[in-house]
Amino acid sequence: MTNRRQLLTATAGLAAAAMLGSPAAHAQADLATPGPLGDVWLGPADAKVSIIEYASLTCGHCATFHKDTWPALKAKYIDTGKVRFTLREFPLDPLATAGFMLARCNGNDKYVAMTDLLFAQQKVWAFTDKPVDALSTMVKQAGFTQDSFEACLKRQDIYDAVTVVKDRGAKAGVDSTPTFFINGQKRSGALSMAEFDKILEPLLAG
């Protein structure tokens, strides 16, 4: 009996070790690890459901989600304490990287308001002949001066931090934007409110 019990224990240990070394386990570890600047969560830490969004500030589908779905999602699930949500950086181009750097430069308490502004006004700054000039004009609404705008975009620490988040996202399986991880399960694309309802209601009821 003792030998059988020892064998079962050893087998379970080997299985656990194999799981820890598997690509799926590494992906979950990358997903669970916040970037150097930390995650900015909305909603209570003990919420039953967590949503991590990976997005690019120059992604049209991401802007569509934040314009059409995000307000209703926030009101129904996050403001009511049922779900917590964070937006992580997955810039698809240097302009999106610059936008995320600017969202981080004034501290995490300004991050959500800044990313909301940049998504809402995406067509004004991201798709123009002079996008950097348009971005500079846009962020002055959030308190930047030309000097602080230029200083922010020269900060290697912020650039490196945004890059770390993107690289970890890629290791976790992000290959397009927006990508959502809902309690660790991957969903790609600008999900509608109806699609979120279909996913979230069973998780909240379980």
Regions found by a protein language model. Give the residues of each.
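C-terminal cap of thioredoxin/glutaredoxin-like
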Residues: T2, Q6, Q28, S56, ...
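Extracytoplasmic thiol/disulfide redox context detector
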Residues: T2, Q6-P91, T163-K166, A170, ...
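Short amphipathic alpha-helical surface patches that mediate protein-protein
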Residues: A12, F119-A120, K154
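Glycine-rich, flexible loop/turn motifs
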Residues: L37-G38, A98, Q121, F149
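Short, flexible micro-motifs
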Residues: D46, L102, S192
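Structural alpha/beta surface segment adjacent to cysteine/selenocysteine redox centers
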Residues: A55-T58, A63-K140
